[in-house]
Regions:
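Short, Lys/Arg-enriched N-terminal segments with co-localized hydrophobic residues
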Residues: 1-15
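Cyclophilin-like peptidyl-prolyl cis-trans isomerases
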Residues: 12-13, 36-231
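Bacterial N-terminal signal peptides that target proteins for export
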Residues: 14-24
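Bacterial N-terminal signal peptides
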Residues: 23-34
Length: 231
């Protein structure tokens, strides 16, 4: 975050402003191999404009991970735009097989880049408007990462501690972990801060190369086996 030199950012600006990056993206997409995402869901996920269902006033999303399960309860009145987007992403399998690529035990854990570069590219420009900050970034609260005003897409983070300093920067929580925070606490964070600030995963390469990049260079990262809306 800015007041500590750290913030839950998406590093999209670097990709958007780097023509070489987009050239590499195009090549990667052409050669991308299928992922474990279900065929029908992959078709939906490639069309963000079609996934705009209004979320229930309150709902729970269950995340089955390589370390166990945790449940997030979402309150639409906290952040309507964020809650709606999250509902559609979870419901349609976007987070399935996604890695927890930025884990900082004294700060937060970040995830939300799809492992298929083609799907990831489809969502890069699917931004939603900012919501007013109605809740503080307390421990266990979930919030979108951003790269600036009105830049939220798919990446989210869970606060490991009370991070009230994020509130005036516009980070609007939309839900909280209601069970399994002990699982969230044990997600692998041995790689440290991501590039270019640290030796951890590079978001740009993850966007362009997908999970293959992480599997090769950061094999110990924990991941989401399946995310679903609880009935």
């Amino acid at each position: 975050v800015r007041w500590q030199g750290r913030r839950p950012d998406t590093q999209q600006g670097a990709l958007m402003n780097n023509p070489l990056s987009f050239s590499v993206v195009a090549l990667t997409l052409f050669a991308a191999a299928p992922t474990t995402t279900a065929f029908g869901q992959a078709g939906n996920l490639a069309s963000p404009a079609a996934l705009v269902e209004k979320a229930p006033a309150n709902y729970k999303a269950k995340f089955e991970t390589s370390k166990g399960a945790f449940v997030v309860e979402v309150h639409r009145d906290w952040a309507p735009n964020g809650a709606d987007r999250f509902y559609n992403l979870v419901k349609n399998g976007f987070y399935d097989n996604a890695r927890f690529f930025r884990v900082m035990s004294d700060f937060m854990v970040q995830f939300g880049i799809n492992g298929d570069p083609k799907i990831s590219a489809s969502w890069r420009g699917a931004r939603i408007k900012d919501d007013p900050v109605r809740q503080s970034n307390r421990r266990g609260y979930i919030t979108y990462a951003t790269s600036g005003p009105d830049s939220r897409t798919t990446q989210v983070f869970i606060n490991y501690r009370d991070n009230a300093g994020l509130d005036p920067q516009g980070f609007a929580p939309f839900g909280q972990v209601v069970s399994g925070m002990n699982v969230v606490d044990t997600l692998y964070g041995g790689y440290g801060e991501g590039a270019p600030r640290g030796p951890g995963p590079d978001q740009g390469r993850l966007q362009m190369e997908g999970n293959a990049y992480l599997a090769k260079e950061f094999p110990q990262l924990d991941f989401i086996k399946k995310a679903s809306i609880e009935r």
